[in-house]
Amino acid sequence: MAYSIANNPLLRKNFAKIKKIIEIPNLIDIQKNSYKRFLQLDVPAEARKYSGLEAVFKSVFPIKDFSETASLEYVSYSLGIPKYDVEECHQRGMTFAAPMKVKVRLVVWDVNKEPSTRSIRDIKEQEVYFGEIPLMTENGTFIINGTERVIVSQLHRSPGVFYDHDKGKTHSSGKVLYSARVIPYRGSWLDFEFDHKDILYVRIDRRRKMPATVLLKALGYSTDKLLNFFYKSEEIFFEGDKLMKIADPELLTNQKAVVDIVDPNTGEVLVKANRKFTKAAIRKMAEHGIKYIPITIEEVLGKVASHDIVDPATGEVLAECNEELTQVKIDEIKGRGIATFKVLFIDNLHVTSSLRDTILIDKIGSTDDALIEIYRRLRPGDPPTLKSALALFENLFFNPERYDLSAVGRLKLNYKLGLQIPLDCMTLTREDVLEVVRYLIDLKNGKGSIDDIDHLGNRRVRAVGELLENQYRIGLVRMERAIKERMSLQEVENLMPHDLINSKPVSAVVKEFFGSSQLSQFMDQTNPLSEVTHKRRLSALGPGGLTRERAGFEVRDVHPTHYGRVCPIETPEGPNIGLIASLSTYARINEHGFVETPYRLVKEGKVTTEVRFFSALEEEGHAIAQANAEVDSDGRFVADYISARKSGEFVLVGRDELELMDVAPMQLVSVAASLIPFLENDDANRALMGSNMQRQAVPLLRADSPLVGTGMERVVARDSGVSVVARHNGVVESVDASRIVVKIDEDEYDETGTGVDIYNLIKFARSNQNTCINQRPVVKIGDHVKRSDVIADGPSTDMGELALGQNVLVAFMPWGGYNFEDSILISERLVKDDRYTSIHIEEFECVARDTKLGKEEITADIPNLGEETLKDLDESGIIRIGAEVRPGDILIGKITPKGETQLSPEEKLLRAIFGEKAGDVRDTSLRVPPGVEGTVIGAKIFSRKGADKDARTELIEKAEEQKLRKDEQDEIRIIRESAVGKLKKLLVGKTAAVKFEGKDGKVLIVKGKAITEEALLSVPVDRWDEISIADDDTVDEKVAQILGTLNQQIDIIKYVFDDKIQKLKRGDDLPPGVIKMVKVYIAIKRKLQVGDKMAGRHGNKGVVSRILPEEDMPYLEDGRPVEIVLNPLGVPSRMNVGQILETHLGWAAKGIGWQIEDMLEKNSPQNQIKTYLKEVYGNKEMNKFLDSLEEEELNNVAKRLKRGVPMASPVFEGASEQGIQEMLGKAGFEYTGQVTLYDGKSGVAFKHKVTVGIMYVLKLHHLVDDKIHARSIGPYSLVTQQPLGGKAQFGGQRLGEMEVWAMEAYGAAYALQEFLTVKSDDVAGRTRMYEAIVKGKHTLEPGLPESFNVLIKELQSLGLDVELLENEEE
């Protein structure tokens, strides 16, 4: 069976040496999965997880009134069917959204006063309309008001706790000050920081700081609890006159012995005085059974009591907790006969006194005072009461409605502080706060590490779903307030849920988010790559993110954790550099929002095929080998030591210590960068430009996939959604330019399935960037297609591969100065062959409104215009399709009523001759703007419901209806044929149980005889279920089932199409005051011309400087002229050598193509062609494929390859120098890749050999036609009366200060006077000039420029009385 060449990836020779381990995940899954998790559409209401919309509803509901006598509870939500489909939304300027209904329950309670209990009085449940919610299209975009938009994912700081220091910059002493910050997902921030005196302070929400112990006391901790939590204590006792302390090994480490420590039994000195207690010494003491050691009084002086020291006899407090012990105190303790007491262990080396010092400066004693102090700091001016202070403090950190750490925040907090708090505890706990402070104090004491906020374990991605979830919550909270008010104002028992709920605030928030949020962007639809990249973009900007001005270098920089997650290359140039990034090819986002990348697991020095995804935190500490580390056939590493990544550094690691290995070399770059062959030979700055410029390539009329690609082209084209992909396996039944019909294979659907797929192709639609979207079939009738095969190419795709530019023959040499400084010299051949011609589609819209003076009308009857002007308008006043239009031509005729004004004599005369009509309307027709010249390719008319339709509308509707009816008939025909085929298999050859008569009584099927196909077809299909089969009851059942299904399907199809036609004929929803809206589409063909910008894929860009006749171009020995001449000096300083390697490999690919063409022309035997192809490909799978081909199929393949054999040189594992030379050899070229060129003008050979080859060159969106602009007369600024600036405003050219100096330097006084007066802002002079020119006089009288009047007014506004005195000469 014929398979289409389009879907054979083997035809591209691949240089990759590493076998593909896993497929690249779908490129737009980041968008689709996020929104899927948000809506949970395919999950039944009761099984929905607590995430997305469900989570928002459950967190805001139930809503109770203030007295808690009623509550509104959430049950479930459901989405309806969108009113318009995607296509209709595009055309009508609507939003593709589904209506949402929420089922809520209103419960009313009776409150019994006596034993304060509640009993349910009433429960009402109801579905309430809750506004519309935009749906995502198949391709991961949203259609808002008729335009496609993308919600860019945001990269923001993850919630959790972060430790940092100021690098010694805050205080003049250069002391390093540590700080901690607890950031929740929503709620108040909590900051702890040390000052230069080592006092610990706390800030809530970045307000004024206060001692940290105020907060800790507010949590209910007393001074002694705090001291004993943060400090260890030592026990000291008296033994006669001596002081002793208990030898606690943990505390003794690193202390010094004050006196000799002697074994009392043997007298052996275990530790000498002034020596440190080492681990060995402590062990020795334990062996000798020493439990306590002598200390001197000096050592105890200045120590701090860890508890109150109380005289047991009298109960008198001798020393308070946190009091320093003096000689007097110690004597008193001893005198009172207290045997032991405890002091805090503070040595100011390993344990500092910062927390104790903080307690000392903190004058607040009780919890209540602490709460009131916090209230005063947060609400200055409010009179504090204990109740309000407690409520405020509880709400700050412990109320789930006000404070939410989120699962991620809790995870990070537990991870950093080593806590075991369950993940569903989303608020702070007292334990959290203590541990945060403890870690901060440890950090100051030299334990623990600070966090790197640019580490991808500390930054997470908020994709569409989560961003919308946050907006939805805001809307619901606004709605909640309104509901509470309504509940308290009205009698609840008389109300239904819908009386309480007004979904306007929610709809408004959603609408605002999609319409005007910084992250909701107009989709970049220039070409398929730009679409995919836009959907995979990560932005650090946006609400809750960074701002360009405040972002420093660190945030923008590449970080080791970006490896395999975020592309180090692709980012914009300019102020956003580093703030906007792109997801790497294999990366995905996990449920916590962290970016993960896949690795192969390594076990005992052997690589397995098992692949696991790791986030940046999970991979920490693992040794990870590169994808190109050499392994043998068993997967064992060849070398003993392997270069690997570990904790952000490259280290040499023994093979047995390796734990992970990259899955592919291109894992670390993004989609756009992975499309650049020989990326490894380009400088990073140029690679950045290359990946950005590929996104600006305009789709060309004739797409041409690159001869030298990377193998990613097919993936991008498939996932971008611009090409049409088969939904099932099947055979192509019919193909034309606008649709493909595929009959599905039998094993693909069950017996009752339909068995037909109809694909309607998009023809010449306009993209967001005015480029042309057009789909072309690549399959023939009878081709067999497999699921997910490409059956039609979209814009910039060729045979299912991305094709952004053209393969052209380039030579690197200077040529007459025309390629100086990145200019490009091109051959006229490229223009003649339409190689770089692109189609651009402009949309023009004209609206007829109902004005105060009467209705506007769209008509061909326009006053004061000749026949010639109106020749292309039809009777409805709309231009005909196919008309060639130029600037100034009328597209849509429209007249607007005008108020009665004083008539001029001419108008009076016209009125007298033609009656009323000509006078009371003015011509407001839509005309073609300057710079647009093209062909009208379509018109759409939208008219108000109930308005009369004009002839053109009826014509358009009729054509649409015919198209729909044809689809309907085809679908029914194929389903019917398929069903008949199945029924024939069942019935033909079976024995009839009864005879079957036609309507005329003629016997069509004889009883007891086998049914023939002829006899069967003489019976109408609808009555086949009446045929009864002998000996087999199942056949009758199956026949009835198939016919039943057939009729059911036909009914469904008819219903669907009738509905579409009904919609077509219905009037349109137009904005208020609009009677009719007409859109006209003009296709503009842009050929390549001087001034257009072109670029390669390696950041090598330039502007076309001259188009040379092909006979003047330098030519090869066989007479072929080159097509583009580039300057060789553009390569060395820019260090993008990849373009040269691409040129060489392209030359080889082309040469091999010429060899194949030569064989075909000479009618070489099949075997010879096969052998040559096998030699070129050198690949077992390809050999197998070639051997399986029949003669005709082989010829088709060879014909396809004679343009050149496509090569894939994947990123970081591309063709080596040796590989390129080998290919050049097979093509019959010299291995240098250089040839002798001849001058096209003289025919003389150039002195040196020149590098010639095939380079893939793109035409970028910066077209000179869009930029060139000229003006004679036009609009003026209101205040200054000077011409406006810019093409969009049809402005003039600015003659600035420097230009005036130049004119002065040349002494061109009169020209300059004209420039500054009559040609600019001298209003009276302009008019005089016009009159003079009309009357044929050429005198110039400049007057006073308007800007002078502006200057005078400005001076007057400063209070200076300036007036202009005119000197009247007698």
Swiss-Prot record:
PROSITE patterns: RNA_POL_BETA (PS01166). GO terms for cellular component: DNA-directed RNA polymerase complex. Pfam families: RNA_pol_Rpb2_1 (PF04563), RNA_pol_Rpb2_2 (PF04561), RNA_pol_Rpb2_3 (PF04565), RNA_pol_Rpb2_45 (PF10385), RNA_pol_Rpb2_6 (PF00562), RNA_pol_Rpb2_7 (PF04560). It is an enzyme of class 2 (transferase). Its EC number is 2.7.7.6. It comes from the Bacteria. It catalyses: RNA(n) + a ribonucleoside 5'-triphosphate = RNA(n+1) + diphosphate. InterPro entries: DNA-dir_RNA_pol_bsu_ext_1_sf, DNA-dir_RNA_pol_bsu_external_1, DNA-dir_RNA_pol_su2, DNA-dir_RNAP_su2_dom, DNA-dir_RNAP_su2_hyb_sf, RNA_pol_bsu_bac, RNA_pol_bsu_CS, RNA_pol_bsu_protrusion. GO terms for biological process: DNA-templated transcription. GO terms for molecular function: DNA binding; DNA-directed RNA polymerase activity; ribonucleoside binding. Keywords: DNA-directed RNA polymerase, Nucleotidyltransferase, Transcription, Transferase. The keyword Transcription applies. DNA-dependent RNA polymerase catalyzes the transcription of DNA into RNA using the four ribonucleoside triphosphates as substrates. Belongs to the RNA polymerase beta chain family. The RNAP catalytic core consists of 2 alpha, 1 beta, 1 beta' and 1 omega subunit. When a sigma factor is associated with the core the holoenzyme is formed, which can initiate transcription. This is DNA-directed RNA polymerase subunit beta.
